[in-house]
Amino acid sequence: MEQYKYDFIEFALSRNVLKFGEFTLKSGRISPYFFNAGLFNTGRDLAKLGEYYATAIQASQIEYDVLFGPAYKGIPIATTVAVALANQFAIDKPCCFNRKEAKTHGEGGQLIGAVLEGKILLVDDVITAGTAIRESMQLIKLNQASLAGVMIALNRQEKGNGELSAIQEVERDYACQVHSIINFDDLVYFIEQSAKHAPYLTKMREYRAKYGV
């Protein structure tokens, strides 16, 4: 596992963004871990989060023209990623995000920031049902742009209602790749190397056996 992935897991644990234990998800599943990126909520944490996204984007070698953050969680992510790319890698990419409802006065429209054109890299925290991606695709197509790829913080690597995960469905439906800073397998590997978190290993493996893709 790359060092930045290990460091990101440590960072998420230190901010209680990532927790191991027993958690009931909206789906009703009992999960041995919980991830809430909304708890990256200070200037320092958001700056660091952007750096991890930027590192993962560079590692993925995605070719893109514009960063797009779907409302609402994707907005601060796209912003901090754009800053991190400029500061860390001297890559100055335009950044765009959407409103949930189109504005009829002022600058108007549904988009804020750069023009949504060319190859779009969508950034978000996680993909649960893929709803934000599908809504974003309507905007991307409306602007004659194309989806170059998606970068999220965590790929849960678990089935939805069918045999595929929401991420696999997005990849199938839009012929794009979904990348992540870390995935479920990385969490398992991290626990395998950590005596402190060893008690959670069995539950994590059981969860993967039951719901993994």
Swiss-Prot record:
One of its GO terms (cellular component) is cytoplasm. Its EC number is 2.4.2.10. Its cofactor is Mg(2+). The keyword Glycosyltransferase applies. Pathway: Pyrimidine metabolism; UMP biosynthesis via de novo pathway; UMP from orotate: step 1/2. This is Orotate phosphoribosyltransferase. InterPro entries: OPRT, Or_phspho_trans_dom, PRibTrfase_dom, PRTase-like. It catalyses: orotidine 5'-phosphate + diphosphate = orotate + 5-phospho-alpha-D-ribose 1-diphosphate.
